[in-house]
Amino acid sequence: MLRHYIKMAMRHLLKNKIQNLISIVGLSVGILCFSICLYCSRFISEVDSCFSNKELIADINLCTTRGDLYSGIPATTIEELRKLRFDEVQDFTFTVYPRERSYNVEIKEGKELPYDHLMTMEVDSLFRKVFTPRILQGSWEVASNTPNAIILTRSLAKRIFGESENPIGKRMILTQRLFTAPDTTPRTGGIAYTIQAVIEDIPLNTSLSFLEKLDMLTLNDSEGTLCPVCHHCIHRFLVYVLLD
């Protein structure tokens, strides 16, 4: 009986080839579009779901009297907010918009390889308390107290050092002069950074860098915008608070 039904179905398909082909293609396109829409809707709805404090994190924005948003918050405003000590707020953290950098990376003693277009975000020491990145190697505490400390993401650490090599303690030499760098920094860079930790990859659907893959974080960056000497000239930051 089953064979009879299969034969009848095949005869029907062969009898109306063009019509059935159009139906199959249309159904396939419909399923594909539905799958893409479902994926995109889940991608958007799960923004920041990787952060364990998601429900307690809020970002702070400045608006004009007309309601237009500024591109960031001045460092002086952040310092004033921290002094006010709101009862509803555990802590503040501020970051800088991610930007590409180029480095010569110490693979082993006496050997360096160039790596360009590494998407880098400068953060402060309270970033971990607010966003709770998972530490795979090294120590965030050590990085917080080390000048020019670098925290690699897992995928970048694997790409540069492979599975067996330990990246902690390796140096990365900046090969460019950042626009935020002091006047004493050469045009070719030459500033040394030290890898102090490796964290789990930060997904693309986060408010930190939506649809941009982060390769690394920097702390206590002498060439960046969070250093005190730069607050008067580069003064726009992204500010997040951890609520009680």
Regions found by a protein language model. Give the residues of each.
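Membrane-proximal extracellular/periplasmic loop immediately following the first transmembrane helix
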Residues: C37-E106, P114, P228, C233-D244
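Phosphate/oxyanion-binding loops and surfaces in catalytic or ligand/nucleic-acid-binding neighborhoods
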Residues: I31-F34, S41, V47, L84, ...
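Mid-to-C-terminal secondary-structure elements
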Residues: D124-L136, L152-D244
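Short acidic/polar micro-motifs at solvent-exposed secondary-structure junctions
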Residues: L62-Y70, T93-L126, L136-I150, T175-Y193, ...
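Solvent-exposed, non-membrane alpha-helical residues enriched in polar/charged side chains
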Residues: K7-R11, S45, R82, K158
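Short, strongly hydrophobic transmembrane alpha-helices
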Residues: H12, N16-I44, E55
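Short, membrane-interfacial amphipathic segments enriched in basic
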Residues: M1-K7
